[in-house]
Amino acid sequence: MSDISKASLPKAIFLMGPTASGKTALAIELRKILPVELISVDSALIYKGMDIGTAKPNAEELLAAPHRLLNIRDPSQAYSAADFRRDALAEMADITAAGRIPLLVGGTMLYFKALLEGLSPLPSADPEVRARIEQQAAEQGWESLHRQLQEVDPVAAARIHPNDPQRLSRALEVFFISGKTLTELTQTSGDALPYQVHQFAIAPASRELLHQRIEQRFHQMLASGFEAEVRALFARGDLHTDLPSIRCVGYRQMWSYLEGEISYDEMVYRGVCATRQLAKRQITWLRGWEGVHWLDSEKPEQARDEVLQVVGAIAG
């Protein structure tokens, strides 16, 4: 697309970053100054009843800066990148039609990628094919299926660990249904985002600072009643660790504690470690991201001013 035609597109802002980097605080600050409406880009914040462990904006923050795509699913329900793209595009169109600018804030990089680049034409899940794969895994083990994937799609096999049955079975399922590999199909992108996007990433300047913030926040969550929140989910009886909601960082570790599998101290240790690993993956995504403007979360006023400098011209 030429620069002239891109300039004629409606404007949007991406505010990305690892967990505990100060994204929400900056987004709320920007909403006071710019004509923006906020859309959450977070695969955990979509769930109702999961507030403390996801660091969901509190009632006061949401009053000052409402977020769209919060609390839109029950924890028993799945929500895909395709679901997000559909919903986000609808919200963006609604915001643009009102003469305002969508500001998408969050840390689920897969959602940002799906929104920006479109989605590959992957086949829908087939319960029969999936059942055959799981039966084979039960008989031969996931290592055997991983070797099978290596033969048909070595690129995907190098990326997927043998102990990751969800992604492994999906890669094989795609091949069995379509006759094409996951790698081949994901190289075919869908429709690009029809917006002129200003992209920002916020993070502390050092990994040590981010690690400190993550540990502090995890302990703050515990002090705020995180255990009671997960106990309420646990008591429902219809939720389990195979669900995306309960696999969320922090929730999975607390669930293991409630099931008596690990001690409280081990839960805290694992929860902090898992959150740090999540942040590392998010930063790895962002380092390979094109056209992103980096902001230092230890200097919030400077970060705000840098965003205003870049996008201020679009606010008139």
Swiss-Prot record:
Tree of life domain: Bacteria
- Name the lineage: Bacteria, Pseudomonadati, Pseudomonadota, Gammaproteobacteria, Enterobacterales
Q: Which reaction does it catalyse?
A: adenosine(37) in tRNA + dimethylallyl diphosphate = N(6)-dimethylallyladenosine(37) in tRNA + diphosphate
- Stated family: Belongs to the IPP transferase family.
Chain spans, region Interaction with substrate tRNA: 42-45, 166-170, 247-252, 280-287
Q: Which GO terms describe its molecular function?
A: ATP binding; tRNA dimethylallyltransferase activity
Mind listing the UniProt keywords for this protein, alphabetically?
Answer: ATP-binding, Magnesium, Nucleotide-binding, Transferase, tRNA processing
EC numbers: 2.5.1.75
Obligatory cofactor(s): Mg(2+)
Binding of substrate occurs at: 19-24
Record's protein name = tRNA dimethylallyltransferase
Q: How does it assemble?
A: Monomer.
Site (Interaction with substrate tRNA) residue list: 108, 130
Is Magnesium among the key words of this record?
yes
- Residues annotated as binding ATP are 17-24
What the entry lists under SUPFAM superfamilies is as follows: P-loop containing nucleoside triphosphate hydrolases (SSF52540)
What are the BP-aspect GO terms? tRNA modification
Physiological role: Catalyzes the transfer of a dimethylallyl group onto the adenine at position 37 in tRNAs that read codons beginning with uridine, leading to the formation of N6-(dimethylallyl)adenosine (i(6)A).
Q: Which Pfam families match?
A: IPPT (PF01715)
> What general EC class does the enzyme of this chain belong to?
transferase
Task: Say which species the protein is native to.
Answer: Escherichia coli O1:K1 / APEC
NCBIfam families attached to this UniProt entry: miaA
